[in-house]
Amino acid sequence: MKTRTFHADRSQPQPGEIFVFGSNQAGYHGGGAARAAHQQYGAEWGVPEGATGNSYAIPTCDAAINPLPLAQIGDAVQRFLAEAVAHPERSYFVTRIGCGIAGHRDSDIAPMFSGAPSNCSLPDTWAPYF
């Protein structure tokens, strides 16, 4: 069984942890966790997915800020998980991606992270789904 690590929702990552947040397909990080990612963790404007600075973007909305379908978010989550598995030396602080501005339910998003490796800290609000 995998060791799961959870952090308090809305808490801050520890020094060195990579801030994983929900973005939009335009890479305009203007609100919610995306804004924090841009202002505090080096997320680059115009980059909708992947690692920049000390952050990792997972698209949850389209360019017009409409929620993406769950299957599309799930595909992006799988790409992130592959990155986390490939880099066990890194620690990832996953926010409640898709559950803020995108409006999805925790019960829909949390299970997408069931394969998360032990170097991913997940929001404690997702603990019941594992």
Listing of model-derived features with the role each one plays in the protein:
Residues M1-F130:
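Macrodomain-like recognition of ADP-ribose-binding/processing modules
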